[in-house]
Amino acid sequence: MVFSPRLSAFVALVALTNAATAVPMYGQCGGSGYTGPTQCDPGLVCVKLNDWYSQCQSGGAQPPVTTTSSPPVTVSPPPSTTTVAPPVATGPPAPEIPAGQLTQLRSFGNNPSNISMFVYKPQNVKNRPGLLVALHPCGGTAQQYFSGFPGFRQHADQRGFIVLYGQSPPGSSNCWDIISTASLTREGGDDSTGIASAVKYALQNWNVDPEKVFVTGTSSGAMMTNIMAATYPDLFKAGAVWAGTAVGCLSANTPQFPPDPCQSGTVIRTPQEWGDRVRRAYPGYNGPWPRMQIWHGTNDFALDHKNLAEQMKQWTNVHNISQTPTSTSPSTPRQGWTKQVYGNGLVETFSGQGAGHGLPESGTEVVAMDFFGL
């Protein structure tokens, strides 16, 4: 069969176009309302994490930089202590935790909803390490967040901090409780209580620097990030929210059909109303609040982009600063993203033109790590 030059050129163009639009490792490849490319790079498969988000992963979905191919191991903690003072450092922290792999903590204190916690300690962990709590999206797991969003542990390898990966409790559809009064209240007896217990355990037993404790998460994990900053502002110095909603916005823990009004971006409140929802999480608290960094894409079909502005209103009100940005930086940290700073850097927002729900985009995690000072 002989092809005409014009047809041959067309075939070559199609091949080039398909190659250009193939989704790289950990990129979004599907989900309800998603209109971007769905074909993964060679050797990758499109893995459904929930109705709203599918991600390109390797066939075995194995973490690319771990030092072991073994599944997560479980260790028993040392006997609990009644003091909150950190131990005197006599060597590398957390000697009972294997370095360079994901390790499950079997017990870490008060855990009323039976969440699971996993720890990643890098080989070069600092003697006085920082701590990052990383919370998976709805439909995900701690292992999936560890493998599918590798930037956090890669930066832990480079900077020597410890990462705690939370996992939502059994029977939760792998979603965090972001609506109950118990979870939205300090020591209320739900998911937020268990996460805080794990942080307190790390502070008591691993020589973690209390000035370098941070929280981050995607989607449902982003919502829980906001909740942790609201319920335990004395534990966390800052949070980074990837595709989330304001505290007290959603009325259900799992995606709804038709969408919850908050999902659709139709829940609009005043800064004072949003701020009050944070303040109610810890009545009487008058200390400093965590700095907050908020990321959202304009093509997020799971949680409307309008939720970025509502979160900004909430946290600027909590910090008692203006809702007018002090600076705007286009093409930051990359083309298509716009950064806005509020007050003296207490709140930052990043709006991604054309970005979907699968945040963080690979390579943008470093901006959050720098914001934290890890």
UniProtKB/Swiss-Prot annotation:
Disulfide bonds: none annotated. It is an enzyme of class 3 (hydrolase). Pfam families: CBM_1 (PF00734), Esterase_PHB (PF10503). GO terms for biological process: cellulose catabolic process; xylan catabolic process. Its main location: secreted. It is found in: Secreted. Glycans are attached at residues 114, 320. Residues 58-99 are annotated as: Ser/Thr/Pro-rich linker. PROSITE patterns: CBM1_1 (PS00562), CBM1_2 (PS51164). GO terms for molecular function: acetylxylan esterase activity; cellulose binding. Pathway: Glycan degradation; xylan degradation. Has a modular structure: a carbohydrate-binding module (CBM) at the N-terminus, a linker rich in serines, threonines, and prolines, and a C-terminal carbohydrate esterase catalytic module. The genes for catalytic modules and CBMs seem to have evolved separately and have been linked by gene fusion. Acetylxylan esterase involved in the hydrolysis of xylan, a major structural heterogeneous polysaccharide found in plant biomass representing the second most abundant polysaccharide in the biosphere, after cellulose. Degrades acetylated xylans by cleaving acetyl side groups from the hetero-xylan backbone. PANTHER family: FERULOYL ESTERASE, UNNAMED PRODUCT-RELATED. This is Acetylxylan esterase.
